[in-house]
Amino acid sequence: MPMLMATRIDIIQKLNVYPRFQNHDKKKLITLSNLDRQCPLLMYSVFFYKNTTTRDFDSVFSNLKLGLEETMSVWYPAAGRLGLDGGGCKLNIRCNDGGAVMVEAVATGVKLSELGDLTQYNEFYENLVYKPSLDGDFSVMPLVVAQVTRFACGGYSIGIGTSHSLFDGISAYEFIHAWASNSHIHNKSNSKITNKKEDVVIKPVHDRRNLLVNRDAVRETNAAAICHLYQLIKQAMMTYQEQNRNLELPDSGFVIKTFELNGDAIESMKKKSLEGFMCSSFEFLAAHLWKARTRALGLRRDAMVCLQFAVDIRKRTETPLPEGFSGNAYVLASVASTARELLEELTLESIVNKIREAKKSIDQGYINSYMEALGGSNDGNLPPLKELTLISDWTKMPFHNVGFGNGGEPADYMAPLCPPVPQVAYFMKNPKDAKGVLVRIGLDPRDVNGFSNHFLDC
C-alpha cells in the first residue's frame, strides 16, 4: 500500500515509565538461564482497536501508563536492563528501575479500514511500534516499550515490544494481560495482579535458578535427541558452504503469509488425510505443514530435512517450575528424515507419531543437555537452513483477548511483527472461530505459490 508507506507517524510525546510501588522482595540481579540469553531483542506485537471517541483515546494513554506503573511494581524485572556478568560474556537482568518507554503517536490521515485484512502482515505495522536505537549496546535498551497510535477513524493501535530475554510467549501473555487489567481496575491491592484469562490472582516468579545448568547432571545424562539436533544444523551448514564456497548469502527477503483455517476446515482435512486416526490440531497441522513446505522447496530427495517445534517445559522438569514462572521455559523437539522418506514413504499418521515421540522425549536429561549446548560458543550467525522447518504454537495464548480496549474490550486483532527468524511458522488462535487456527509463516517469494497450493490442497 504505497499511500500508507509514505504516511507520516507524528510523535506526540515519549516518556519513561517507572514502577509505582517499591517491591521489598525485589532482587537486584536476576541470573538468566541459557534459554533466556538466546535472543535479547525486542519482540513486537500490535493490538488493533476500532472506533472510539477522542475523549476515550485521550484516556487510553494515561490509563496504560498507570497500568504499566502498577504492573511493573510486581513484574519488576520489566523495569530493569540487561547487563553482562563479571566475565563479560553472559547476559543477566539488572533490576535497576531503569523503566519502560511509552510513546503517543498519530497516523495522520489513515483509517484502520485502509490497512485491509489485518491478519496479513503489512510493512506499515512496523511504524506502529517504538524501536529504540541500540548501537549494539543492550545495556541501554528498555525491556518493555509501547506505542499508542491514533487513526483518523477514531480507532487506535497499541504496539508492544518485550525483550525475549525477559519473557517467552506464555509469560509475555500473562504480563500483557496483567497490564491490561491494571489499566482498567483501580480498586485493587498494589501487591496483586489479576489475570483476565482465568480471573484469578497470580504472582509472577522471576527467579530462574531452577533452569540454571547443572553440569554434573549433564555429564550423567547425554541426550541423544539434542545431539542429533545440532548434528543436523551443522550438516546443513556444511552443505551450504560446499555449494556456496564464496559464502555469498542469497536474498534474505521473506514474504509473511497468514493462512486462516476454521475449525470445520481443519476437521475436514484431518478426516481426509488420516482416515480415522485421532490426533490434535497441532499434531496434524505440524505434520502437514512440514510436508507441504518441504515439497514446495524442491529439495534433493537425499537431503536431510528436520522439523523442530517449541515445547513448554514448565511441567516437564523433575521439579515442576512454579506457577507464574516468568522466564523462558521452552526447548525445541526435533524430528528428522530424508526428503524422499518424508514425501514418498511416511504417511501423515506416521509423522504424527514421530512428533509425539519427540515431544515425549523432553525430560530433565534432554532439558539439561539442550541448555548446556546453548551455552556453548557461537561462531556467528547460521546461514539459511532451508531444510529446517520451525513451528511455534501460540494457540493457548489468545492475545486478541487482551483487554486494552474501551472498558477492557478485547482487541479486534493482534498482529505479531516480523520476528528475527522470519521463516518460523506460528500457529495462532483464530479470533473468529474458537477451534480455528491462523498459520503465519515467512516464505521465500519463489516458494509462496508452491507452498500455498500444497498446504491448502489436502
Swiss-Prot record:
Belongs to the plant acyltransferase family. GO terms for molecular function: acyltransferase activity, transferring groups other than amino-acyl groups; long-chain fatty acid-CoA ligase activity. The active site is at 164 (proton acceptor). Induction: Induced by 24-epi-brassinolide (24-epiBL, eBL) and inhibited by abscisic acid (ABA). Stimulated by auxin. Disruption phenotype: No obvious growth phenotype under standard growth conditions. The bat1-1 mutant exhibits longer stems before flowering, but reaches normal height after flowering, with larger inflorescence stems containing an increased number of vascular bundles. This is Brassinosteroid-related acyltransferase 1. Keywords: Acyltransferase, Brassinosteroid biosynthesis, Endoplasmic reticulum, Lipid biosynthesis, Lipid metabolism, Nucleus, Steroid biosynthesis, Transferase. Pathway: Plant hormone biosynthesis; brassinosteroid biosynthesis. GO terms for cellular component: endoplasmic reticulum; nucleus. The gene is BAT1.
